[in-house]
């Protein structure tokens, strides 16, 4: 019996592979547990179509991330904060503040994507890493000024 594996099965194969198994093992274990599906032409074609659609979506998402990277790297965000002596900020710049400032420039992303190497506690120019996903990282320029 030929089956299409719906998940990785140790000692048999990886998800998406078509493997030959004994009828009892295929019917009573793999198919019964939802680990595989009988490999008919219809099932194989449906699976391949799903794979193509997933690849197209991933490519589209990657293109959007590349565009977002270009937008982020072309920006210089200016944040105005209250300062004390020696241009020291009251508090520090947070990821949330950076995310909100980015939204003003029509760049919407979650604060968890922003990485601040060291706490920003004084005025000046800084660079912050933004991890967009799929290995795409952008460098955002920050300018912190006194209010």
Curated annotation (Swiss-Prot):
A GO BP annotation: translation
Keywords: Ribonucleoprotein, Ribosomal protein, RNA-binding, rRNA-binding
Record-linked Pfam families: Ribosomal_L9_C, Ribosomal_L9_N
Record InterPro entries: Ribosomal_bL9, Ribosomal_bL9/RNase_H1_N, Ribosomal_bL9_bac/chp, Ribosomal_bL9_C, Ribosomal_bL9_C_sf, Ribosomal_bL9_N, Ribosomal_bL9_N_sf
Record bears the keyword Signal: no
PROSITE patterns hit by this protein: RIBOSOMAL_L9
This protein's GO CC annotations: ribonucleoprotein complex; ribosome
NCBIfam families, per the entry: L9 (TIGR00158)
Similarity section: Belongs to the bacterial ribosomal protein bL9 family.
Record's function text: Binds to the 23S rRNA.
Name of the molecule in the record: Large ribosomal subunit protein bL9
Organism of provenance: Helicobacter hepaticus (strain ATCC 51449 / 3B1)
Upper classification of the organism: Bacteria, Pseudomonadati, Campylobacterota, Epsilonproteobacteria, Campylobacterales
